[in-house]
Amino acid sequence: MTVRTKVSTKDIDEAYLRLKNIVKETPLQFDHYLSQKYNCNVYLKREDLQWVRSFKLRGAYNAISVLSNEEKNKGITCASAGNHAQGVAYTAKKLNLKAVIFMPVTTPRQKINQVKFFGDSNVEIVLIGDTFDHCLAQALNYTKQHKMNFIDPFNNVYTIAGQGTLAKEILNQAEKEDKTFDYVFAAIGGGGLISGVSTYFKAHSPHTKIIGVEPTGASSMYQSVVINHSIVTLENIDKFVDGASVARVGDITFDIAKDKVDDYVQVDEGAVCSTILDMYSKQAIVAEPAGALSVSALEQYKKQIENKTIVCIVSGGNNDINRMKEIEERSLLFEEMKHYFILNFPQRPGALREFVNDVLGPQDDITKFEYLKKTSQNTGTVIIGIQLKHHDDLIQLKDRVCQFDPSNIYINENKMLYSLLI
């Protein structure tokens, strides 16, 4: 069997017909808050409302459904940080197939539980590897040994075509309301979504600019297409945006992206966290980190999108509630609202009250106070966390901290120290 490497609009049209009674046609919603904030017309494609709460069902079902009966009977495997696994599990249950699903050990518990829920007895889960790429290597080895069929999360023509049905759906919905779009913002992990969407848009709405969005700590497509002009493997990636933390993109997705994606945006993980909280509080949308990437990119593109009509694909909503504390912490650090210092603190009654009176501003709060080391001397080493009401107050706060302890250490500027102590 010849392995195909080119995706056509015909592939996407055929995938659309296969998926018509399988996936949900998710809403294309006008967003008043973002439209007012950026002085443009912002529409959100709500794939967080899909049956498995992400777009990944489209590609997984399409890729599995084209297998022969003989191939289906041998069973399927996949490697996934969560959402593709849920799509494969849902499909395995629907088609009554055996599936072995490999997931990194860092996968949020919520996503693991959802895979079990969707796949039930049809699915076996193997947790292995710290990153997707390590997990992928183990899955491929297992697939070969057991002569099963690997369902690639992004580097497969049928997976990409399935994701591309999103673009067809967007254009169909827009046509009903006589709309056209100037920009589409979509997240990039391995590149399956951006490849499918860009393929269809460039054929049917060539004036629309396609903007790929990656987390700063895992910008493998940008590094490959723009910087290196060939596929690179990132040595280290930040795994926080787990749905888009891929060290190496696919060769098929790379070839499509370099020809059809107009620009790339890298978004700081802290900015993603701020977007997650903003979407929840302002729009009542529960987005996972990768699902919030497209909206996060608008801040960097605010001049270009003014008075334009744009679509942000909210690619997933599988967020683990147990991560919210970390999300809030990362957001506060990014917004420069929370600050940590190591101080030599007087070990005598009333010292903390003096610190509050002399160092803290009237609207500042102490969020952490912990002795690293108590001694018999006059001072002890303390970690102190301070949350500001306004980030503009930081300079004055640092000045007052220096007066209190000229030898203080500002932890925010040292990522390694922060990870060790906070």
From Swiss-Prot:
Gene Ontology process terms (BP): isoleucine biosynthetic process; L-serine catabolic process; threonine catabolic process; threonine metabolic process
> Which residues does UniProt call coiled coil?
none
Cofactor(s) for this UniProt protein: pyridoxal 5'-phosphate
Q: What is its EC number?
A: 4.3.1.19
Binding locations of pyridoxal 5'-phosphate? N83, G189, G190, G191, G192, L193, S315
N6-(pyridoxal phosphate)lysine modification sites are K56
Q: What keywords would UniProt list here?
A: Amino-acid biosynthesis, Branched-chain amino acid biosynthesis, Isoleucine biosynthesis, Lyase, Pyridoxal phosphate
Q: What class of enzyme is it?
A: lyase
Q: Which reaction does it catalyse?
A: L-threonine = 2-oxobutanoate + NH4(+)
- Which part of the chain is the ACT-like domain? 339-413
Q: Which is one Pfam family of this protein?
A: PALP
Q: Which InterPro entries match?
A: ACT-like_dom_sf, IlvA, Ser/Thr_Dehydratase, Ser/Thr_deHydtase_PyrdxlP-BS, TD_ACT-like, TrpB-like_PALP, TrpB-like_PALP_sf
User: Where are its TM segments located?
Assistant: none
- What is its pathway? Amino-acid biosynthesis; L-isoleucine biosynthesis; 2-oxobutanoate from L-threonine: step 1/1
The UniProt GO MF terms for this protein read: L-serine ammonia-lyase activity; pyridoxal phosphate binding; threonine deaminase activity
- Family, similarity comment: Belongs to the serine/threonine dehydratase family.
How is the subunit organization of this protein annotated in UniProt?
Homotetramer.
Its job: Catalyzes the anaerobic formation of alpha-ketobutyrate and ammonia from threonine in a two-step reaction. The first step involved a dehydration of threonine and a production of enamine intermediates (aminocrotonate), which tautomerizes to its imine form (iminobutyrate). Both intermediates are unstable and short-lived. The second step is the nonenzymatic hydrolysis of the enamine/imine intermediates to form 2-ketobutyrate and free ammonia. In the low water environment of the cell, the second step is accelerated by RidA.
The protein here is known as: L-threonine dehydratase biosynthetic IlvA
Instruction: Record the organism.
Output: Staphylococcus epidermidis (strain ATCC 35984 / DSM 28319 / BCRC 17069 / CCUG 31568 / BM 3577 / RP62A)
